[in-house]
Amino acid sequence: MPDKPYRIQTPSGHRKYLCSGLYLPSVTTVLSATESSKSKAGLRQWQERNPGALQAAAARGTAIHKCCEDFLRGIEVSCPDEYRPFWNGMDQYLEWFDELHWSERPLRSDWNHLRSEDKEVAFVWSTEHKYAGCPDLVGEIGGVKVIADFKTSTGPYTNTFPERGDRIGYGGFRKYQKCAQQMAAYRLALGERVGFRCDVALIIVSTEETTQGIFIDGDQLDLYEQRFIKRCQMFHENEDNNETEDCSQQELPEQNEPAKVC
C-alpha cells in the first residue's frame, strides 16, 4: 500500500505535499510560478487596483465548491444569498454525471490510499514529474470518463483566441488555457496513481449572469499535458538553481484551440 499523502505549510506559507516520500508543489503553484514576468506584473497591478478582490474571489470559489460537493453527495445545498447567482445553473451540468468516482475525495474504496491519514483531504500526484493536487470531480457521463473543474468568474471563459483589443475575451482565453493545463495535470497524475485515464475534461464556469460547460477532448488534453510537463521542468530547474525551503523538519499533520461549449 502506498504511503499516505500529507499537506504541509512551508515556513513562508506556501503549500506543499508529502507524497511517496517526496515534497511536491501543487499544480497551481507550478502554474503561477512559471507565468511570464509580464503576466506576473499584470496580476500585481490588478491587485493594486482592486484591493480585496482576490480574497473575495477565493471566498466565492470556496462557497460554490461546497455547494457542488454537497449536491453531488446528495446533501441539501445551502448557498449563501450573495453567491446564489453563481450557483444557479451549475446543478444542470452536475446532473449529467451518472457515475461518480471522486468529489474532492475518492468515492471508491480502491482509491482510498489517496486520502490523507485523517481522511479529510485527498490528492493525486506524479512522482515522475513531481507535483500534486486535488481534482474537483472525476466521473462518467454515458460511459465516457470525465474530469471536471468548477470555476467562478466575473466574466465568461473562451476557448478561441479573441479579436485584437478584446480585453475581456483575452482574459477569458487565458483563464481557459490555465484551467485546461490544470486538468491535464490532474488527469496525468490520476492515471499514474490508479491507472484511470479520463477521456475528456469539463470546465464548469459560473458568472453572475450565466453558466458555461466547456468540454476539452482527449487530443487537446494531451497537448495541454505536454505544456504542463514543460512548465514542471522549468519550475524544478528554477527551484534547483535557487535557495529552497527545507520542509523535512516540518511537523506532519494528522491528516485558438477549439472545444465544445455547451
Set out the residue ranges of the language-model regions.
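Glycine- and charge-rich intrinsically disordered segments
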Residues: M1-P2, N238-C262
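Generic recognition of cysteine residues
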Residues: C19, C67-C68, C79, C134, ...
